Amino acid sequence: MPKLKTKSAVKKRFKLTASGKVIASQAGKKHFMRRRTKAQIRNLRGTTILCPQDGYNIKKYFLPYGIN
């Protein structure tokens, strides 16, 4: 049986930490930035850890070897 492939879209958008949590970049920073304050824009930088249920769904359905 051949190896399962990882979904390319998920591979580009998410990463797993050593403890198994899922990291994603902050959402909501593509457009409509002019109506946001500088503090809001600053808070959208970087990455965030997904909530446990969302992380579980990403690992279960899109990363074939993500859940042991």
Swiss-Prot record:
Pfam family, one: Ribosomal_L35p
InterPro entries referenced in this protein's UniProt entry, alphabetically: Ribosomal_bL35, Ribosomal_bL35-like, Ribosomal_bL35_CS, Ribosomal_bL35_sf
Residue ranges of coiled coil: none
Keywords per UniProt: Ribonucleoprotein, Ribosomal protein
Keyword Ribosomal protein belongs to the record: yes
An annotated GO BP: translation
Keyword Ribonucleoprotein attached: yes
Cellular-component GO terms for this entry: cytosolic large ribosomal subunit
A GO term, aspect molecular function: structural constituent of ribosome
NCBIfam families, sorted: rpmI_bact (TIGR00001)
Family as reported in the entry's similarity comment: Belongs to the bacterial ribosomal protein bL35 family.
Protein name: Large ribosomal subunit protein bL35
Annotated gene: rpmI
